[in-house]
Amino acid sequence: MYPRSCDTFVALPPSTEGQRIIFGKNSDRPCDEVQEVVYFPAKEHEPGKVECTYIEIEQVEKTFAVVLSRPAWLWGAEMGANEHQVCIGNEAVWGRESADGDEALLGMDLVRLALERADTAEKAVDVITDLLEKYGQGGNCMEDECGFTYHNSFLISDRKEAWVLETAGKHWAAERVEAGYRNISNQYSITTKIDKEHPGMRTYAKEQGWWDGESEFSFTDVYSYSSTARIQAAGGRYCEGQKLLQKSNGHISAQTMMDILRDKESGINMEGMFMSTGSMVSVIPKADHLPGVHFFTATPDPERSVFKPFVFVSDVPPLKHTSSPCFGEEDPVKKKPRFQSKPNRKHPLFLKHEVAAAIIDSSGERGQKIEKEMRDLEKQKLEEMEKYLTEGVEDSSLLVHLFTDTVEEEFSVYSSA
């Protein structure tokens, strides 16, 4: 059982409306996996270690505030943003270099670590690649004993630019994106435009017989398989994603990105054993004085979910409605051998949404009413956020409970149906 889908997108001026950067991602994971949305405030740390999903690494003196969408069983994140409006999403990729099953840093750990430690997209590239060099990547990426492993690619953006970072073990290449749009799927996509790279990347490829040392170096051509079903499936979605971005080129907005993430015909909104278990859209104005707005579903299938806004302000409390139960040291992920059981990780919103989704699937009048009210709520929040995106935030206290309040409005939609 391998994922065929996972897609991350970014659009920059002049492709977007209003001098904004629009970031979006679907997290496509096992259909029974719960994805939570959690917030961690900025924090100063004493010298010591931080425990990631499988290993401990050196902690830094200060970590930035982050909002994350993540599989509820692990430490890292599939996607998220930080207080400096850096956004990151990662994808599984496979290539000629074998993925390591030994426990190290997961790609999802690297997403969180970069968000906690980097205040620009380029610095996030440096954080990830430095950690790769020191600790490596590897370990089981699913909550069972299957031993499912992969390399990672990352799409990273901030207020000014975006970066694509693609890895194969400790080797990597990175491409800067300063205008237009870019997307990544479950395949390597960096070719000859390489703006940063591992110092041994080309030498290693030559030693492996993947490159002759003379022809023009294309990271994708050298490090990819020549042909696999996974790459072919991802290639179809990669091209479809580009087409959907091109269709709205010049006026890409948050609504555009939400529509793309909901597109089932292209395979971007995944269904089946692997499905879109969580979705994110961020709107980042280029002007420093304007806030970024980060929308998360915290529920499966964006087509029947509500994108809810989050804004970084002081004193944001824990996001209790989208946080899964904590099992501490008794969690089967922490015990060895790992994954001997699977606890119920459903958070309050997931439980209520699960009931509502079943009603929607029945295709009756009640389900149609729920869907309409969900869309109305989302539209209302998009319109409300437009004021902050254009005028800034005068009273930040109004936004402290923004995400949680919106979840409670979503609860009301489900309760009234």
UniProtKB/Swiss-Prot annotation:
Modified residues (Glyoxylic acid (Cys)): C6
One family name in Pfam for this protein: Peptidase_C69
Propeptide: 1-5
Residues that bear Pyruvic acid (Cys): C6
Keyword Repeat: no
Keywords of this entry: Pyruvate
Protein's GO biological process: proteolysis
Protein name: Secernin-3
Organism lineage string: Eukaryota, Metazoa, Chordata, Craniata, Vertebrata
